[in-house]
Amino acid sequence: MSSKLPKKSEENLELPTFPASEESLSRSEKLKYVFVRNPFIPLGCLMTVGTFLASGYYIRRENHLMANKFMRYRVMSQGFTLAALAFSVLFIGPPRREAPSNSSGSINSEIKK
């Protein structure tokens, strides 16, 4: 039974963390890739941080009505972020890769017959 399980070194080689085209990207290029791929997730994160900071501002000013209002906005922006994340996982999915070409052509010839 243990002979069927792959070794840990083989597991790491089979599951890359990024697609091969993204390995050479810098941090700013990866951030740009995320914004282009699904702009609503970073937007939701920025909205959450902004409303949280505004709520803290109003707490320091002792305006508790506005602080509570911005805490409600924070919860709504977190919900927006989670909805955007769920949408991207369910409908957009991972980037598609090209299928590897078969040099022998035997599979293609069998399908044509």
Swiss-Prot record:
Residue segments, region Disordered: 1-27
Start and end residues of each HIG1 domain: 12-103
GO biological process: mitochondrial cytochrome c oxidase assembly; mitochondrial respirasome assembly
Domain of life: Eukaryota
Signal peptide stretch: none
Gene3D superfamilies, alphabetized: 6.10.140.1320
Keyword annotations from UniProtKB, A to Z: Membrane, Mitochondrion, Transmembrane, Transmembrane helix
Gene Ontology CC terms: mitochondrial inner membrane; mitochondrion
UniProt topology in membrane: Multi-pass membrane protein
Entry keyword Transmembrane helix: yes
Keyword Metal-binding: no
Positions of transmembrane segments: 39-59, 75-95
Location of this chain's protein in the cell: Mitochondrion membrane
The protein's name: HIG1 domain-containing protein C25B8.07c, mitochondrial
Organism field: Schizosaccharomyces pombe (strain 972 / ATCC 24843)
Taxonomic lineage from the root: Eukaryota, Fungi, Dikarya, Ascomycota, Taphrinomycotina
